[in-house]
Amino acid sequence: MGMSSRTNPKVAVLMGGPSAEREVSLVSGRECAAALRGEGFEVVELDAGSDLCDRLRASAPDVVFNALHGRWGEDGCVQGLLEWLRIPYTSSGVLASALAMDKERSKEAYRAAGLPVAASQLADRAAIEAAHVMQPPYVVKPYNEGSSVGVYIVTEAANGPPVLAPDLPATLMVEEYVPGRELSTTVLGDRALNVTDIITDGWYDYHAKYSPGGSRHVIPADLPPEIFELCLDYALRAHKALGCRGLSRTDFRWDESRGAAGLFLLETNTQPGMTPTSLAPEQALAAGMSFGQLCAWMVEDASCDR
């Protein structure tokens, strides 16, 4: 089922929501709504709350542009609601969204597709705080959040295991830390667009991602041709392995000292940041597609049964 054939379809842009990434989603949603209006679409902005079903029925959009980030908006929940209401929507469907959001399950899919991932395990927070569950350096993070929310890096020089914030879940992912460069590739439809080298003063955390001057993006990344092509290949294969649709962004770490063997896939984001200076729109722009054109493409690509 595709979107309405109306020449000026009505688009509901979902944003905000209750997740830890609410503020980022509000920025993405407002930028996308403005861009879609500029492309001639009729737009209604919806801050997703417990009354979302009623508000969707009342606004009666032809298509939903999903600009939600994090849990509930990116993990298959809102996608299931939209399938039930039979409203065409952007980006990935229920299964791909749920799979990509679960870092452990997505790693199983990557391994099955022959994609390289860092060693990892799930562990109880009590065990993580009691002793090193992996030889440092390693990373501790929620297995079902994005935007580097709740991420801890335990260095080789650490005197002991980390003391975790009390609001983190009881089960967390512990992952081998891969030194080196942070790289990212966007997939649009069936094409991997480019590779961005993300340069920061330290870890690419929430602050570096969303604060002005927190990071610098080099596009195209200055990489050996083999590594550049591997990023494109791995991102497209990850997109397909998870069953993604529309737009996705896959992030990597590359340890230059190990050559091609040092490139590891971190995760695939089915709802990447959507402001004109976000990674995915930057790569689309480098491919000749403006931010407005990217948003319009996503609306035109929308469907149910994704």
UniProtKB/Swiss-Prot annotation:
Keywords recorded for this protein, A-Z: ATP-binding, Cell shape, Cell wall biogenesis/degradation, Cytoplasm, Ligase, Magnesium, Manganese, Metal-binding, Nucleotide-binding, Peptidoglycan synthesis
Binding-site positions, Mg(2+) 2: 267, 269
Cofactor note: Binds 2 magnesium or manganese ions per subunit.
Biological process, per Gene Ontology: cell wall organization; peptidoglycan biosynthetic process; regulation of cell shape
Annotated localization: Cytoplasm
Chain segments annotated as coiled-coil in the UniProt record: none
Catalyses which reaction(s): 2 D-alanine + ATP = D-alanyl-D-alanine + ADP + phosphate + H(+)
Names of the cofactor(s): Mg(2+); Mn(2+)
Superkingdom, taxonomy of origin: Bacteria
Main location: cytoplasm
The protein's Enzyme Commission number: 6.3.2.4
Assigned GO CC terms: cytoplasm
Signal sequence extent: none
InterPro entries the UniProt entry points to: ATP-grasp, ATP_grasp_subdomain_1, D-Ala_lig_Van_CS, D_ala_D_ala, Dala_Dala_lig_C, Dala_Dala_lig_N, PreATP-grasp_dom_sf
Pathway per the UniProt entry: Cell wall biogenesis; peptidoglycan biosynthesis
One Gene Ontology term of the molecular function aspect: D-alanine-D-alanine ligase activity
Family designation: Belongs to the D-alanine--D-alanine ligase family.
NCBIfam families: D_ala_D_alaTIGR, PRK01372.1
PANTHER family: D-ALANINE--D-ALANINE LIGASE, D-ALANINE--D-ALANINE LIGASE B
Protein role: Cell wall formation.
Protein's name in the database: D-alanine--D-alanine ligase
Organism this protein belongs to: Ruegeria pomeroyi (strain ATCC 700808 / DSM 15171 / DSS-3)
